[in-house]
């Protein structure tokens, strides 16, 4: 008879597991001991944005933070180079150790998909919109791997950045539609001093492109302040900023409601942009208030609304 034993776990230290069965056994034992499991899924190449998610997760009382590092092949399209995605595992582990993370899950493709990809999660119509229109199959790959991570780790909460707002919305849709008992927590976008959203892709920008990339966040901020005049006013203001940078090839610039349905005539909304600089594709978004819900002075409302981040510059 084979007696299964829980893999070793050292509290207060960084524990790295690659086998799904091992991390599942450890998190199950921790839950039995009364600890809460919180998950931060990543593809590695960690930057301050990822570490902000980790810090938010660590604020959960009684939590053990699990960070997964897995470059998921399912979310790469035929024209996207999976092999070119940056892999910096040793640097990532050093950063996570400094943050006090106790569990890192680093599976391989064969660990996650031992029998191939026979089953996947269909994201519905929203999965083919916005990002999905230029990256077919991307969100099916994202939802499939995240659902697998949920099944393996069994977290109480999972933390995701608002920079990938469509992804965040689809994950909330998935857990609601499939009755997945995990709370999805969105964390505001982390930005450079000029407003550029942190992204692993920023490393591909040369000096000139890095300067030009600041136009995305500037356009969003212009749209935010113009939104009192309606969705079209927000788009016009944002477009005027983007047009000043001919090197930017804009894929889309849209206003949507918070669940990414059609733009509202009035109320809370999201302004989203995607553009290319050379071979690098960048995305960003910002919460806006459309129409009469904006302040009477024409500036966006600022208050206790947890869905809205403050402007990052005046």
UniProtKB/Swiss-Prot annotation:
Active site: 50 (proton donor)
GO molecular function annotation: ATP binding; pantoate-beta-alanine ligase activity
Lineage top rank: taxon: Bacteria
Positions bound to (R)-pantoate: 75, 167
InterPro entries assigned to the protein according to its UniProt record, in alphabetical order: Pantoate_ligase, Pantoate_ligase_C, Rossmann-like_a/b/a_fold
Subcellular location: Cytoplasm
Main localisation: cytoplasm
Keyword Nuclease in annotation: no
Recorded coiled-coil stretches: none
Ligand binding (beta-alanine): 75
KW ATP-binding (keyword) present: yes
GO BP, one annotated term: pantothenate biosynthetic process
Leader sequence segment: none
Region (Disordered): 112-131
Catalytic reaction equation(s): (R)-pantoate + beta-alanine + ATP = (R)-pantothenate + AMP + diphosphate + H(+)
This protein's UniProt keywords: ATP-binding, Cytoplasm, Ligase, Nucleotide-binding, Pantothenate biosynthesis
Enzyme nomenclature, EC number: 6.3.2.1
Entry binding sites for ATP: 43-50, 161-164, 190, 198-201
Pathway: Cofactor biosynthesis; (R)-pantothenate biosynthesis; (R)-pantothenate from (R)-pantoate and beta-alanine: step 1/1
Further remarks about this protein from its record: The reaction proceeds by a bi uni uni bi ping pong mechanism.
Family of this protein: Belongs to the pantothenate synthetase family.
UniProt function note: Catalyzes the condensation of pantoate with beta-alanine in an ATP-dependent reaction via a pantoyl-adenylate intermediate.
Oligomeric form and interacting partners: Homodimer.
Record HAMAP family: PanC
Protein name as catalogued: Pantothenate synthetase
Organism field: Mycolicibacterium smegmatis (strain ATCC 700084 / mc(2)155) (Mycobacterium smegmatis)
């Amino acid at each position: 008879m084979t007696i299964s034993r829980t893999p070793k776990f050292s509290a207060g230290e960084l524990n790295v597991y690659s086998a799904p069965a091992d991390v599942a056994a450890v998190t199950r034992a921790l839950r039995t001991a009364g600890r809460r499991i919180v998950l931060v899924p990543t593809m590695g190449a960690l930057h301050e944005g990822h570490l902000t998610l980790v810090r938010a997760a660590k604020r959960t009382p009684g939590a053990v933070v699990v960070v997964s590092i897995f470059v998921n092949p399912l979310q790469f399209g035929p024209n996207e180079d999976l092999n070119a995605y940056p892999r910096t595992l040793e640097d990532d582990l050093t950063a996570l150790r400094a943050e006090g993370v106790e569990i890192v899950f680093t599976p391989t493709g064969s660990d996650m998909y031992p029998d191939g990809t026979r089953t996947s999660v269909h994201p519905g119509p929203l999965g083919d919109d916005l990002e999905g229109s230029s990256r077919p199959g991307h969100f099916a790959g994202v939802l499939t791997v995240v659902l697998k991570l949920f099944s393996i780790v069994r977290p109480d909460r999972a933390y995701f950045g608002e920079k990938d707002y469509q992804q965040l919305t689809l994950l909330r849709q998935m857990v609601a539609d499939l009755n997945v008992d995990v709370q999805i927590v969105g964390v505001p976008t982390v930005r450079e001093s000029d407003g550029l959203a942190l992204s692993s892709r920023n490393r591909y920008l040369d000096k000139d492109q890095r300067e030009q990339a600041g136009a995305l966040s500037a356009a969003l901020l212009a749209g935010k302040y113009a939104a009192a005049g309606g969705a079209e006013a927000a788009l016009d203001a944002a477009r005027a900023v983007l047009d000043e940078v001919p090197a930017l090839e804009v894929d889309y610039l849209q206003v949507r409601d918070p669940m990414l349905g059609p733009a509202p005539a009035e109320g809370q909304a999201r302004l989203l942009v995607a553009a290319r600089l050379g071979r690098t594709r960048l995305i960003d978004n910002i919460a806006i208030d459309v129409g009469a819900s904006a302040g009477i002075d024409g500036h966006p409302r600022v208050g206790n609304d947890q869905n809205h981040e403050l402007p990052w510059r005046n």
